[in-house]
Amino acid sequence: MTEWITAPGLTDYQEALAFMEARAAAIAAGEAGELVWLVEHPPLYTAGTSAKAADLLEARFPVHAVGRGGQYTYHGPGQRVVYVMLDLNRRGRDVRAFVKALENWVIDALAEFNLRGEIRDGRVGVWIARPDKAPLPDGSMREDKIAAIGVKLRRWVSFHGIAINVEPDLNHYAGIVPCGISGHGVTSLVDMGLPVGMDDLDLALRRSFARNFPPLAG
């Protein structure tokens, strides 16, 4: 059975990296079980393996270069970071299917708050259509990102994971081009007018987890 841990307070990012790497290695060695780790971080930016220097507009907070996929993203208070240390040796060695399952998991959790999350080809993460905002210059509808996804696999065990905006300071995103995508914005559950707290989201994530990541046999 997949273990769940919720970290109290704000978790130092480098300590989180060290913990994830150690746990992923233990899972790969058969010495530990899968883990979903729920944390919040102090304000910081992370740069994934595809990050472009031009997308760091202003280093307002510490910048951490990390080995996960993706580009620049922001972490900070009011954002639920979901670190997923799952064994793809047992769940299927299919990276695309794994990322799709992560996206669907977030979409299922958001649906509990009657919020429709969507995915877009070429734009990993979960998006919210914003017909209430002015359209883009080409006439297409604006979309705001509510959840970013970036994972790394080592010996087919995942780490890093998902960042879902509950009530972060969205102005903190101004220092980067989030995930290298300009033209679209970012939003949060509270920004969408939902009176949702971190505990509410955590419960929704727990309820929807098994639908996307069935329990392992044995």
Curated annotation (Swiss-Prot):
The lineage of its organism: Bacteria, Pseudomonadati, Pseudomonadota, Alphaproteobacteria, Rhodobacterales. It comes from Paracoccus denitrificans (strain Pd 1222). GO terms for molecular function: lipoyl(octanoyl) transferase activity. In the reaction, the free carboxyl group of octanoic acid is attached via an amide linkage to the epsilon-amino group of a specific lysine residue of lipoyl domains of lipoate-dependent enzymes. InterPro entries: aa-tRNA-synth_II/BPL/LPL (IPR045864), BPL_LPL_catalytic (IPR004143), Octanoyltransferase (IPR000544), Octanoyltransferase_CS (IPR020605). The active site is at C179 (acyl-thioester intermediate). Catalyzes the transfer of endogenously produced octanoic acid from octanoyl-acyl-carrier-protein onto the lipoyl domains of lipoate-dependent enzymes. Lipoyl-ACP can also act as a substrate although octanoyl-ACP is likely to be the physiological substrate. The gene is lipB. Belongs to the LipB family. CDD domains: LipB. It is found in: Cytoplasm. Its EC number is 2.3.1.181. This is Octanoyltransferase. Residues 30-217 form the BPL/LPL catalytic domain.
